[in-house]
Amino acid sequence: MGHTDDMLHVMEWHNGDKSYLPFSEAEMDRRQNDVRGWMSKSDVDAVLFTSYHCINYYSGFLYCYFGRKYGMVVTADKATTISAGIDGGQPYRRSHGDNITYSDWNRDNFYKAIRQLTKGAKRIGIEFDHVHLDYRKALEEALPGVEFVDVGQASMWMRTIKSDEEIKLIKEGANTCDIGGAACAEAIAAGVPEHEVAIASTSAMLREIAGNHPYVELMDTWTWFQSGINTDGAHNPVTNKKIES
């Protein structure tokens, strides 16, 4: 195998223009500034978010794990998502803030990206409820001398207080669910397989979502529909079992 020293390890992959986000710039600035307010009170130099929910909430980018790590670093004056090269420029387009990409040429390139974004930081907030023991050890090895403090609970309380924009989107989501429920009820009949009912419901919701937003990523919309014995658990998967009268 050849040497990888001359390969790109951390880079900017700013392909295209920023995409439409469901929340305004003012709303996203508010969220990031809430983090900075906590940093100031807690004497923290930078925050590294790693969970789906926090990265999505504070940047607008929802990652797909696919065996690679993702992050978002918030400092006093900047917010940057960290993504894998497999995603191309999409994370940049979906991030409120900057983005850097790491390649697969070295296994520790993700940590190189973190070091690049947290130079000089002595106290860094991480999500204790998301960073497992091996992950924590790798962070300590990558950032020697840095003290890690928990931002997980503080960020949870920040996300708990909903803004007017969030409440509006929640109401739209509830209405979409009502439309899916109506389509589900209409499709139910003896002899119809569960999956056909679920398809009718999910399709109705997807069309509603697609029609109500100027640009939207259509993902993770589905219907849990069960019949007969399958109704004994809330999260029992859809099957091809036919509905009995």
Task: Identify the role of each PLM range.
Residues I55-Y65, G152-W157, I161, V192-S245:
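Short catalytic-site patches enriched in acidic/histidine residues
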Residues A185-V192:
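C-terminal helix-coil-helix/basic helical segment that borders enzyme active sites and/or dimer interfaces
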Residues M1-G180, V238:
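A composition/biophysics-driven feature that prefers long, compositionally simple stretches
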